[in-house]
UniProtKB/Swiss-Prot annotation:
GO terms for molecular function: thymidylate synthase activity. DUMP binds at R21, R176, R177, R216, S217, A218, D219, N227, H257, L258, Y259. It catalyses: dUMP + (6R)-5,10-methylene-5,6,7,8-tetrahydrofolate = 7,8-dihydrofolate + dTMP. Pathway: Pyrimidine metabolism; dTTP biosynthesis. This is Thymidylate synthase. It is an enzyme of class 2 (transferase). Coiled coil: none annotated. NCBIfam families: PRK01827.1-2 (NF002496), thym_sym (TIGR03284). It comes from Listeria monocytogenes serotype 4b (strain CLIP80459). Its EC number is 2.1.1.45. It comes from the Bacteria. The active site is at C196.
């Protein structure tokens, strides 16, 4: 997609070198927006393969209100493993090798990388096999799904923001309050990772549903391709439920950054030519957005260039 390649190029040419929480370092810019017409095809990278089923299972995980990686692992989805693993290795229950700064060390030390990978595999297996262990160490805190579906009020009540949003689109589509927020200051200290994609708003006009996302922190090479596909999918799912066509997905970013250890991968991607976008295919079976399974969602005509691997910064 040209919009995304333009973002990569813009940050390479105009970004500022900054330090960051992970110790990796970034090239960063503040304030950037992309627009995607969802009528023109499903917006997923074609200049590198994005594992769409991982996008699907993560979004369904959010929609279920789940915050434990066990569901993700049951669907062969490893994208949140590092944050749960980090919590475990910092606990008194962990008795293995020292895992301090495991992400950076694994990137720089091949011998340590083997040790880290072995510990991670043991951790994943235990999450899947031991429910009590999973309940304790698979939990990521009150991240996205919890805030979307069970926002706790000061009176001890809960708000299902997503269900309320869908009902409001049906009954008052002209509302300017079609908003869901994952940014809950009270819960931030206990989250494994505070929400990067922190607030989204819907807009109805001419029989079409559009979505705008505000993302406070945007990992351009690894995270943003998932975010684009995820919120485009969410827009399609909600549009189906409320009887509207899809309009635009508008992606607004705060700190949009390229990690310093992703620069060569970005240059490789920029050398590739975008292909035709695929079409999203949704099963007619699910009654509501909350009834979808991974098998109900697929892409037709997705023929991307090969994946480009890059390390994740934790």
């Amino acid at each position: 997609m040209k919009q995304y390649l333009d973002l990569e190029k813009y940050v390479l040419e105009n970004g500022t070198q900054k330090g960051d929480r992970t110790g990796t370092g970034t090239i960063s810019t503040f304030g950037y927006q992309m627009r995607f017409d969802l009528q023109e095809g499903f917006p997923i990278m074609t200049t590198k393969r994005v594992p769409f089923k991982l996008v699907v299972s993560e979004l369904l995980w959010f929609l279920h209100g789940d915050t434990n990686i066990r569901y993700l692992l049951q669907h062969n989805n490893n994208i949140w493993n590092e944050w749960a693993f980090e919590r475990f290795v910092k606990s008194d229950d962990y008795k293995g090798e020292d895992m301090t700064d495991f992400g950076l060390r694994a990137e720089r030390d091949s011998a340590f990388k083997e040790v880290y990978q072995a510990e991670m595999e043991k951790f994943k297996a235990r999450i899947l096999e031991d429910e009590a262990f999973a309940n304790k160490y698979g939990e990521l805190g009150n991240i996205y799904g919890k805030q979307w579906r069970e926002w706790k009020t000061s009176q001890g009540e809960t708000i299902d923001q997503l269900a309320d949003l869908i009902e409001m689109i049906k009954t008052n589509p002209n509302s300017r309050r079609l908003i869901v927020s994952a940014w809950n200051p009270k819960d931030i200290p206990n989250m494994a990772l505070p929400p990067c994609h922190s607030l989204f708003q819907f807009y109805v006009a001419d029989g079409k549903l559009s979505c705008q996302l505000y993302q406070r922190s945007a990992d351009i090479f690894l995270g943003v391709p998932f975010n684009i596909a995820s919120y485009a999918l969410l827009t399609h799912l909600i549009a189906r439920e409320v009887g509207l066509e899809v309009g635009e997905f508008i992606h607004t970013m705060g700190d949009a950054h390229l990690y310093n250890n992703h620069i060569e991968q970005v240059k490789e991607q920029l050398s590739r030519t975008p292909h035709k976008l695929p079409k999203l295919v949704l099963s007619d079976k699910p009654a509501t957005i909350f009834d979808f399974d991974v098998a109900d969602i697929s892409l037709d005509g997705y023929n991307p260039d090969p994946a480009i691997k890059a390390p994740i910064s934790v």
